[in-house]
Regions:
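Conserved nucleotide-sugar donor-binding
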Residues: 157-168
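A conserved acidic beta->alpha catalytic loop
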Residues: 37-48
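Conserved donor-nucleotide/metal-binding helix-loop-beta segment in metal-dependent transferases, i.e.
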Residues: 103-120
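Active-site-proximal specificity loops/subdomain of glycosyltransferases
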Residues: 55-85
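Short beta-strand-to-loop element that shapes/binds the nucleotide-sugar donor at the catalytic cleft/hinge
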Residues: 119-133
Length: 168
């Protein structure tokens, strides 16, 4: 079942092998996403188009929107915000090297409530170690084992972040 509460985006520039794994991790969970190709090499842009043959994947080539050289993260965020508002959905940003687990996005959606602007997933590497900027969590790990939500004033990464429609 494709979720209708999220407009999911993934900015990509080359690194197609890991990006393809990240894309399929989202689609395999029943979600659709929009991949923003930020001026990848021609063969990589072509591979993204081949991947987009799946009806749950749309590829937007930034070169069709601007001639500004990469990175174009601001433009991607502006376009995505506008689309999420049109669709009345939350905006979810997933970086192209983040392989989500099956329940991650549903768990993030469960945290959306009035007054919450952002919900971020703490990402880990393949060995289960916290990724930067979450290194400080290893010292506090025992405190978080029983909590679904961690209120933090520390920095967080946009590696896998949901921006609520209310915030947009």
């Amino acid at each position: 079942m494709v979720n209708d509460q999220l407009h999911i985006i993934m900015p990509v520039k080359d690194s197609i092998a890991i990006a393809e794994r990240a894309i399929h991790a989202i689609v395999d969970c029943g979600y659709t996403l929009c991949v923003y190709d930020d001026n990848s090499l021609p063969e990589n842009a072509q591979r993204l188009d081949e991947i987009a043959n799946d009806k749950h994947i749309q590829v937007v080539h930034i070169s069709s929107l601007t001639d500004h050289p990469s990175p174009n993260y601001r433009l991607v965020l502006q376009q995505s915000q506008q689309q999420a508002l049109i669709e009345n959905k939350h905006l979810l940003i997933v970086e192209s090297d983040v392989i989500i687990k099956a329940n991650t996005l549903n768990r993030m959606l469960e945290e959306v409530q009035e007054g919450v602007g952002m919900v971020a997933a703490v990402t880990v590497d393949e060995q289960g170690e916290y990724n930067f900027p979450y290194h400080y969590l290893h010292r506090l790990r025992y405190r978080f084992l029983s909590k679904k939500t961690i209120d933090t004033k520390k920095r967080f990464s946009f590696c896998c972040t949901l921006l609520t429609n209310e915030l947009l």
